[in-house]
């Protein structure tokens, strides 16, 4: 988590096995907040004996297995509006209810700045919370043009200078090779993530 923070990466925590017999989910959430800070706030909460999850951001209604959906929603709103002075003024002085659409941009900003670390509860075994997690990633997670760009350098040692990566398919390729493996039939294979440009089958 610290390494991700140092690199300016957005962070999201997934708590799996919420339906395990020995699961103490309130304690898990407390431990996460103690380890990584008060920025760790649930986007959903287990409900119906961990057979499903209840949304605490888009549609904060219903009962959960622990904690209060309304209080959790309030904590999320308070955390998100702190990064946007204009929105905070509107929220505090006028007491207006903020729609999720108004919170989308400051939510992404809070993620980029490390001011919010969402916690999502799921069960890979039963599928509880999986669809909701995918919805969160689609609707709230920054895409490459919205997130913090990777920190790249051109050159080595004292001569290295920063290079600003732009997620543009038309520019020259900038990629990060994160693993090299050897296949006895194919030979050496490099696994990489493209940050800029386009790579095709016949790229040199």
Would you name each region that the model predicts?
Residues 1-204:
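Structural and coupling elements of P-loop NTPases
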């Amino acid at each position: 988590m610290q390494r991700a923070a140092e690199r300016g990466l957005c962070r999201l925590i997934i708590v799996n096995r919420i339906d395990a017999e020995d699961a103490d989910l309130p304690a898990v959430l407390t431990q996460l907040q103690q380890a990584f800070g008060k920025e760790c706030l649930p986007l959903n909460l287990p409900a119906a004996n961990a057979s499903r999850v209840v949304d605490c951001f888009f549609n904060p209604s219903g009962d959960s297995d622990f904690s209060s959906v309304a209080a959790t929603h309030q904590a999320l709103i308070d955390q998100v509006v702190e990064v946007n002075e204009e929105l905070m003024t509107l929220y505090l002085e006028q007491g207006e209810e903020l729609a999720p659409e108004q919170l989308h941009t400051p939510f992404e900003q809070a993620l980029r700045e490390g001011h919010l670390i969402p916690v999502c509860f799921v069960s890979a075994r039963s599928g509880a919370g999986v669809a909701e997690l995918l919805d969160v990633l689609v609707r709230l997670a920054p895409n490459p043009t919205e997130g913090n760009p990777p920190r790249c350098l051109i050159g080595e040692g004292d001569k290295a200078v920063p290079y600003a990566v732009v997620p543009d398919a038309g520019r020259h390729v900038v990629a990060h090779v994160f693993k090299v493996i050897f296949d006895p039939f194919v030979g050496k294979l490099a696994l990489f993530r493209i940050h800029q440009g386009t790579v095709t089958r016949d790229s040199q």
